[in-house]
């Protein structure tokens, strides 16, 4: 007796803006999720052929292998400067940087502050996992008070290291005409909210309205010394209380 075959409709697939090369990230790392969101947005806005991504130092340094668009590698922290030059020479391009906190909030602080203050027409995806992941788990500018790292095993002491940098709040002060938001990817609801914010940041550039940055709170289970599930719980319990989610600057709020 022959069984009838039902044609299955594919309802979930890899974004067209991503290559087939597997992710190099540790289990539970948030970079893979965020990469996919960026690629989905590029597909939906139909901007892949005109997109140019800027790769920066850190765990995501090899993302030029993941995004199926033109990519440029920048020196450590210099992504916004490279993006600025590229966008000014090729205003028709959709230029974005993808940076971690050890890149953007440390050696690259000057570049991101001035790019935002000029309201450069670029998009920045900024991943904040509170630690230098690629180099062994050292303290980052975003490491929380008391958080233990390989460079400060006793935990961050604000009297010695200062306080963690809230980049989204800082940039909203120097660039009130920009779109600046902080989101998280610790569960499905917040993943979808992150995607919406990424789409808005790209739309700012497409419309010629200026600078857009989305700070994404992500997990680094390897350097946090936690399993993936507990890492997501830590984002809710410890990270978000210091780095509250929200939209800190948006042109729609003016007036």
What is each of the regions a protein language model found here?
Residues 140-207:
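Conserved thiamine diphosphate
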Residues 2-133, 196-200, 207:
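Thiamine diphosphate
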Residues 109-114, 134-148:
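Active-site-proximal loop->helix
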Residues 57-59, 129-131, 187, 215-223:
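Glycine-rich beta-alpha junction loops
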Residues 69-71, 115, 140-144, 230-233:
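Short, hinge-like loop/turn segments at secondary-structure boundaries
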Residues 2-11, 15, 20-21, 205-255:
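Flexible, low-complexity linker and terminal segments
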């Amino acid at each position: 007796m022959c069984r009838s075959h039902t044609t299955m409709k594919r309802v979930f697939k890899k974004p067209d803006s991503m290559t087939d090369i597997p992710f190099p990230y540790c289990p539970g790392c948030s970079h893979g999720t965020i990469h996919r969101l960026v690629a989905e947005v590029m597909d939906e806005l139909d901007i892949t052929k005109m997109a140019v991504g800027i790769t920066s130092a850190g765990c995501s340094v090899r993302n030029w292998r993941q995004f199926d668009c033109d990519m440029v590698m920048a020196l450590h922290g210099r992504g916004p400067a490279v993006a600025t030059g590229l966008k000014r020479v090729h205003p028709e391009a959709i230029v974005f940087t993808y940076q971690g906190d050890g890149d953007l909030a440390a050696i690259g602080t000057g570049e991101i502050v001035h790019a935002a203050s000029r309201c450069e027409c670029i998009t920045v995806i900024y991943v904040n996992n509170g630690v230098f992941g690629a180099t062994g788990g050292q303290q980052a500018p975003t490491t929380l008070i008391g958080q233990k790292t390989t460079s400060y095993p006793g935990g961050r002491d604000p009297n010695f290291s200062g306080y963690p940098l809230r980049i989204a709040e800082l940039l909203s002060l120097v660039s009130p005409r920009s779109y600046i938001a902080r989101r998280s990817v610790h569960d499905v609801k917040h993943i979808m909210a992150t995607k919406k914010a990424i789409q808005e940041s790209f739309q700012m550039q497409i419309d010629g309205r200026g600078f857009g940055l989305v700070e994404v709170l992500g997990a680094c289970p390897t350097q946090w010394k936690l399993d993936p599930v507990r890492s997501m719980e830590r984002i809710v319990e410890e990270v978000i209380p210091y780095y509250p989610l929200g939209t800190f600057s948006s042109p729609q709020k003016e007036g």
